Amino acid sequence: MMEGQQHGEQLKRGLKNRHIQLIALGGAIGTGLFLGSASVIQSAGPGIILGYAIAGFIAFLIMRQLGEMVVEEPVAGSFSHFAYKYWGSFAGFASGWNYWVLYVLVAMAELTAVGKYIQFWYPEIPTWVSAAVFFVVINAINLTNVKVFGEMEFWFAIIKVIAVVAMIIFGGWLLFSGNGGPQATVSNLWDQGGFLPHGFTGLVMMMAIIMFSFGGLELVGITAAEADNPEQSIPKATNQVIYRILIFYIGSLAVLLSLMPWTRVTADTSPFVLIFHELGDTFVANALNIVVLTAALSVYNSCVYCNSRMLFGLAQQGNAPKALASVDKRGVPVNTILVSALVTALCVLINYLAPESAFGLLMALVVSALVINWAMISLAHMKFRRAKQEQGVVTRFPALLYPLGNWICLLFMAAVLVIMLMTPGMAISVYLIPVWLIVLGIGYLFKEKTAKAVKAH
């Protein structure tokens, strides 16, 4: 245990293996896949499949690096614990708070999406009203106990998975039975101007948006402290990520782009709506809206869980106020859930004041925070592995391609930042990174000063 972990109580280990597996899976199927893929298809054409394969490989390397650390030391606060222990107290402080802010931003974005999806049925309801209602409901559920969160996420994820699998099967049937019409042919993947119609540039420029789709995979690391059997469930969930990326992202996009020429995809429609259009309008439109609504709620649900656990871990390390390191008699960190909720509620206000511009900026900020997050996992892992080697410890679940894999990941992160600088509307979030790091530095110095003052008394 780290120093500063004596106070506060323990989180309950209430998550079963099936919960962990589906939390990992659900984290990867969100708004990014359902809606974000349209603009990528317009720019990269069928090359989007290659883009998801590359980003998926990087995500898998990062997951394995996190997995190796978590199996050795399953604690609350996930990788901020490793950054803190193996890299230094500022790294722990910065990575923990960055992760917390990342998921507050994702929570804001998903709540905004929920408001938009509800308007599909009830256009007269303003987005902030639906956002506020679901905000209250999901926070209330998370305040009960971790088993309820696990169950809810389990069923949310099942709905999303069934929808994607049904789409792949139905699309495959249309393709191979001839019922998809004359335009449905596998040759659509290379006939319309080639596999990479706009060359590699078209694909490379979209890597930041593709990366947004993979944010959330690292949720598995956060669940470790509440998993019944982390040394079995974490490696299993981590290794299955690769099949899931292949099936859900690459499989669904390959079917989708074979069914009709990619040139017919429009940026403002979910490509998944287009494919199911064949079934008849109203049924499909409603069914799909339920699925995308579930996807957004599921990711928001995970955000509430994640934020509260990260803040709890920070408080245990002494990097957040002590009051946040307590749990109630059911093992729920009530204070951290309420603090995270309070900050997220602020974004309901932002959406109320500036509904148009808020969403795009939130997305770009999410990718920037995600880049910092993944880079820190990779760097902390290198420090962790070095420390273990010096102690002569052989880890039970070693990461792939160490240390080359870590350098590949870091190069990829740097490339994503360069791409964002060249993308209109995204550059601002890259310029905000140094500002954010300065804010973290000031926060850290304030914390150190306060700690010294307390010790002096």
Curated annotation (Swiss-Prot):
Knockout consequences: Mutants show reduced aromatic amino acids transport and are resistant to p-fluorophenylalanine, beta-2-thienylalanine and 5-methyltryptophan.
Membrane-related topology note: Multi-pass membrane protein
Induction: Contains three promoters, P1, P2 and P3. Repressed by the regulatory protein TyrR, which binds to TyrR boxes. In the absence of TyrR, the RNA polymerase (RNAP) has a higher affinity for P1 than for P2 and P3 and occupies the P1 promoter region. When TyrR and its cofactors are present, TyrR inhibits the binding of RNA polymerase to the P1 promoter by recruiting RNA polymerase to the P3 promoter. P1 is not repressed by TyrR alone but is repressed in the presence of phenylalanine, tyrosine or tryptophan.
Location, primary (coarse class): membrane
UniProt note on regulation of activity: Strong, mutual inhibition of uptake by tyrosine, phenylalanine, and tryptophan. Transport is also inhibited by the aromatic analogs p-fluorophenylalanine, beta-2-thienylalanine and 5-methyltryptophan.
Alphabetical list of InterPro entries matching this protein: AA-permease/SLC12A_dom (IPR004841), Amino_acid_permease_CS (IPR004840)
PROSITE patterns, sorted: AMINO_ACID_PERMEASE_1 (PS00218)
Location of the protein in the cell: Cell inner membrane
Cytoplasmic membrane side: 1-18, 64-98, 146-147, 214-239, 301-330, 381-402, 448-457
Keywords tagged on the record: Amino-acid transport, Cell inner membrane, Cell membrane, Membrane, Transmembrane, Transmembrane helix, Transport
Family: Belongs to the amino acid-polyamine-organocation (APC) superfamily. Amino acid transporter (AAT) (TC 2.A.3.1) family.
Function statement: Permease that is involved in the active transport across the cytoplasmic membrane of all three aromatic amino acids, phenylalanine, tyrosine and tryptophan.
Name of the featured protein: Aromatic amino acid transport protein AroP
Taxonomic classification: Bacteria, Pseudomonadati, Pseudomonadota, Gammaproteobacteria, Enterobacterales
